[in-house]
Amino acid sequence: MSGFDEGNVTVSGGGGKGGFKKNNGFVEDTSVRDLFKRFINEWKDQDNVFIYKEQLRQHYNLGWHYIEVSIDHLTDFNQELSGRFISSPNELMPSFEDAIKDIIKEMNYNKEQVDEDIQILFKSSANPEPIRYLRAGLISKLVKVQGIVISASRTQPKPSTMVVKCKNCQHTQTLHIRPGIVSSVLPQQCERGSNDAGKPCPNNPYVVLSDQSTFVNQQILKLQESPETIPTGEMPRHIILSLDKSLADKITPGTRIKVLGVLGIFEGGGKRREIAGGTIRTNYLRVLGITSDNAGRDSMHFTPSEEQSFKVFSRRQDLRNIIASSIAPSIYGHEDIKRAISCQLFGGSSKKLPDKMRLRGDINLLLLGDPGTAKSQLLKFVEKVAPISVYTSGKGSSAAGLTASVIREPSTGEYYLEGGAMVVADGGVVCIDEFDKMNVDDRVAIHEAMEQQTISIAKAGITTILNSRTSVLAAANPVYGRYNDAADDNINFQSTILSRFDLIFIVKDPKNEKRDFIISKHVINIHEKSSRSGGSGSVGNNTYDLSNTVVDDSHIGENEVTIQYLKKYIAYARSRISPRLSEDAVTTLKNHYVSVRAKSKEQEMINNGSYGGGGSKNSVETERKKRKNAIPITVRQLEAIIRISESLAKMSLSPIATNEHAKEAIRLFDISTFDAITTNNTVNETLTPERLENIRTAEKYLKDRVPIGSSIRIKDVRFQLSRSGLDHFTILKAVDILVGRDEFEFRNQKRTLFRKQ
C-alpha cells in the first residue's frame, strides 16, 4: 500500500465476465483464504455450537447478506492471522470474502455461484483510539474509535463493478471499484485502439453501462469526539466514516457508537486543497463494524462490593441531605435547589404506552433570579458530573445549534443532516445559561425537544426524527436584571416554554446582614483553602471517567460523598431502578393537583376581578382574555410531580415511589413553581372608582401624546404622569392594560413603550 488511496480501479479482461483481480500488486493468498474458511467452519463456543457457521446459514436463508465476526475469536484461533489482518486489512479482506463464498457454495449444493457478496462485519474488545491521536502511522491499518455521530448524508449508490463500453469500437471491459471513498476514473484510452473499419478510438471513449454494472449502498457519517472526553479549552475533533452495504441507513445523528475500520485518506476538496496545490489529504475510516456505545447512558460495570456499598448507602436516613450537600459543595445555601438538581440527575421513569407513545422521565429545571446567586456555577457543576452533558449560552445559541440543521457540503453540493446540542446530549443534560437572552424564535424551536424528546426535521428533502432524550437545566435573569417584587415585572417567557419546566425556582439575593456575613465567611474560606492547596479547589477542569474506577466506603464522608462516588451511584440507580407509584402516592398526587388547580383558578379570578368596580365593560372583558398566569398549571405539572416522586424513590434505590416520596415532591413543587406563580400575581388590590378614573386619565394621556408607530421611554411616562399627581401603581396599571389590549407593546427590554394602534 502506498498510503494514498489511489489505484481505485482494477481491470478484469474484456467481455465483462470477471477474471483475475489485481489489488495494487497483491496476489490472492490461498493459505489465508483456507485458514479463514477453517475458522468459520470450526470455531465453537462454550456450548460446542459452531456459532459462525450457524450464523452464516441463518443469515443467508433470511436474506441477510452479512456475518459478524469477533477479532478476539480470530486471535484465539490463529494469532498470526489476526495480527496480519490488523496491520493489513485491505490485503486480507478479499481472501476473507472469497472464503465466505466458498462456505455458502458448500451449504447450497444446487448453486454453483453466490448471487451477492456477503459482507463481513468485525467487532473487537480492544480499547478505542482517541480521534485526535489518529496519525499517519495508522493509515491502512485497522483502528477502533468511539464518539458521537453529528451528521449523516443520504444513502447513495456506489459502483462496485462498473462495465464500460467504447463508443467507437464497442469494446467492453469491467472495472472493479475499491470500497471506501474513492473516485471512479474511466480509462482515457481504448484498449482496442480502433474499430473494425480501422477508425481510431478518440480520447475518453468509454461510457458506463449501468444495467450491467453492480452497485452498493454507501453513506457518509461524521463522527465527533464525545463532549466529556474533550480536554478543557480544546476544539472537538471529528473524522469522516464511510459505510456501505448493510451498514448504510442504520445510524442517525446523536447516536454514540464504537467503530472498527480501516484508516484511509482521500483528496480533500475546497480552498485548502487549491492553496496546497492539490496535495492535501483528509483522513477517513472505511467502516468494517459498528457497535452501540451506551457508556454515557448508565452502562457502567459495577463490582459486587460496589453494589453492596450502594445498597447500604441507600438505606441511610440522611441520604437526601448527603446527596444534596454533595451537589456543588463550594456553593453556600440553595439546599432546595440542590435537592431539585439531584432529582434531575437521577431522573424519573420513562414509559412506553400501548399506543407507542412515550412519556419522558427526564426532569427540566429553570433557575430564575438575581445576578451573583451562583446559578451559572450550579450549571457548570452539573456539566462536569453528569455522564453526558453539553453547556451552552443562550446568547450564543441558535435554533439550529440547539436542535439540528441541514448543511450543504461545498465540494459535492450534497445536503446532509447535522445534530445540535440537544441531539449530542442525548441521554444526558443540556445546561443553557442566559436563557432569557435567547431569541424568542430559537426558544420555540426546543419545545418539541423538551416535551416529546424528539427533533423533527423536514428541510432540503430530508425528513427525519432525531432523539433528544435530555434534561434541560436553564438559568435566566429577570426582565430588569434583578428581581422586582412588583407584579409582571420578572418573568418574560411564554407560558408554552414555562409549562415544559418541571420546577421553576425564583433565586433572590436579599440584603440580610447575618446572611451576608455567613456567605462572605464561606467564600473567603474557599479562597484560603484553594491558595493553601495550590489547586483550583473545584472540579471545574476535571472530567471524571469512572468506567474503570472502583469506589468504596472511603468515598463516603460524614456530610457528603466524593464526586466519583456520587456519579457512579447515580449511574447505578439509573440503570437498575425504574420506580412506579404506590396507591397512596397516587391518591396524594391526585388530590394535590386538584387543589393546586383550584388555587390557580382563584388567583386568576382575583387578578381579572381587580379591574372591576366600574369602567368600560369591553375593557374589562379584554383584560380577562388577555391576562393569564405566566406559569400555567396544567397536566404537565402533575406529570412533573410524578417524575420528581419517582426520582426520589430512585435516589433511595426503591422500586416503589411511596406516599412520603410524593409529599417531598409536592414540597419541592410548592416552594418552586407554585411559589413563582403566586409571586408573579401579587396584585390583588380591589380598584376603587377613583383609582379607575385615574387609570383612564393615564390611558388617555398616553394615547394623546404618543402617535401610532411612535415610541416613548417608560422613564418619561413615569416622570410626566407623576407630575400630574398620579402614583406609581396607577401609571404601571395603565401601561399594563394598554399592552394587554395590544394597543401598545414593550420594546428594548421594557424600557420603551411603542404604540401599535
Swiss-Prot record:
<keyword id="KW-0347">Helicase</keyword>
<keyword id="KW-0547">Nucleotide-binding</keyword>
<keyword id="KW-0963">Cytoplasm</keyword>
<dbReference type="GO" id="GO:0003697">
    <property type="term" value="F:single-stranded DNA binding"/>
</dbReference>
<feature type="domain" description="MCM">
    <location>
        <begin position="319"/>
        <end position="523"/>
    </location>
</feature>
<dbReference type="GO" id="GO:0042555">
    <property type="term" value="C:MCM complex"/>
</dbReference>
<dbReference type="InterPro" id="IPR027925">
    <property type="entry name" value="MCM_N"/>
</dbReference>
<dbReference type="InterPro" id="IPR054125">
    <property type="entry name" value="MCM5_C"/>
</dbReference>
<dbReference type="Pfam" id="PF21933">
    <property type="entry name" value="MCM5_C"/>
</dbReference>
<keyword id="KW-0539">Nucleus</keyword>
<comment type="function">
    <text>Acts as a component of the MCM2-7 complex (MCM complex) which is the replicative helicase essential for 'once per cell cycle' DNA replication initiation and elongation in eukaryotic cells. Core component of CDC45-MCM-GINS (CMG) helicase, the molecular machine that unwinds template DNA during replication, and around which the replisome is built.</text>
</comment>
<dbReference type="Pfam" id="PF14551">
    <property type="entry name" value="MCM_N"/>
</dbReference>
<dbReference type="Pfam" id="PF00493">
    <property type="entry name" value="MCM"/>
</dbReference>
<dbReference type="GO" id="GO:0005829">
    <property type="term" value="C:cytosol"/>
</dbReference>
<dbReference type="InterPro" id="IPR018525">
    <property type="entry name" value="MCM_CS"/>
</dbReference>
<dbReference type="InterPro" id="IPR041562">
    <property type="entry name" value="MCM_lid"/>
</dbReference>
<feature type="short sequence motif" description="Arginine finger">
    <location>
        <begin position="499"/>
        <end position="502"/>
    </location>
</feature>
<keyword id="KW-0131">Cell cycle</keyword>
<dbReference type="GO" id="GO:0000727">
    <property type="term" value="P:double-strand break repair via break-induced replication"/>
</dbReference>
<dbReference type="InterPro" id="IPR001208">
    <property type="entry name" value="MCM_dom"/>
</dbReference>
<dbReference type="InterPro" id="IPR033762">
    <property type="entry name" value="MCM_OB"/>
</dbReference>
<keyword id="KW-0238">DNA-binding</keyword>
<dbReference type="Pfam" id="PF17855">
    <property type="entry name" value="MCM_lid"/>
</dbReference>
<feature type="region of interest" description="Disordered">
    <location>
        <begin position="606"/>
        <end position="625"/>
    </location>
</feature>
<dbReference type="InterPro" id="IPR031327">
    <property type="entry name" value="MCM"/>
</dbReference>
<dbReference type="InterPro" id="IPR027417">
    <property type="entry name" value="P-loop_NTPase"/>
</dbReference>
<dbReference type="InterPro" id="IPR012340">
    <property type="entry name" value="NA-bd_OB-fold"/>
</dbReference>
<dbReference type="GO" id="GO:0005524">
    <property type="term" value="F:ATP binding"/>
</dbReference>
<comment type="subunit">
    <text>Component of the MCM2-7 complex. The complex forms a toroidal hexameric ring with the proposed subunit order MCM2-MCM6-MCM4-MCM7-MCM3-MCM5 (By simililarity).</text>
</comment>
<keyword id="KW-0235">DNA replication</keyword>
<dbReference type="GO" id="GO:0003688">
    <property type="term" value="F:DNA replication origin binding"/>
</dbReference>
<comment type="similarity">
    <text>Belongs to the MCM family.</text>
</comment>
<dbReference type="Pfam" id="PF17207">
    <property type="entry name" value="MCM_OB"/>
</dbReference>
<dbReference type="GO" id="GO:0004386">
    <property type="term" value="F:helicase activity"/>
</dbReference>
<protein>
    <recommendedName>
        <fullName>DNA replication licensing factor mcm5</fullName>
        <ecNumber>3.6.4.12</ecNumber>
    </recommendedName>
</protein>
<keyword id="KW-0067">ATP-binding</keyword>
<dbReference type="GO" id="GO:0016887">
    <property type="term" value="F:ATP hydrolysis activity"/>
</dbReference>
<dbReference type="GO" id="GO:0005634">
    <property type="term" value="C:nucleus"/>
</dbReference>
<dbReference type="GO" id="GO:0006270">
    <property type="term" value="P:DNA replication initiation"/>
</dbReference>
<keyword id="KW-0378">Hydrolase</keyword>
<dbReference type="InterPro" id="IPR008048">
    <property type="entry name" value="MCM5"/>
</dbReference>
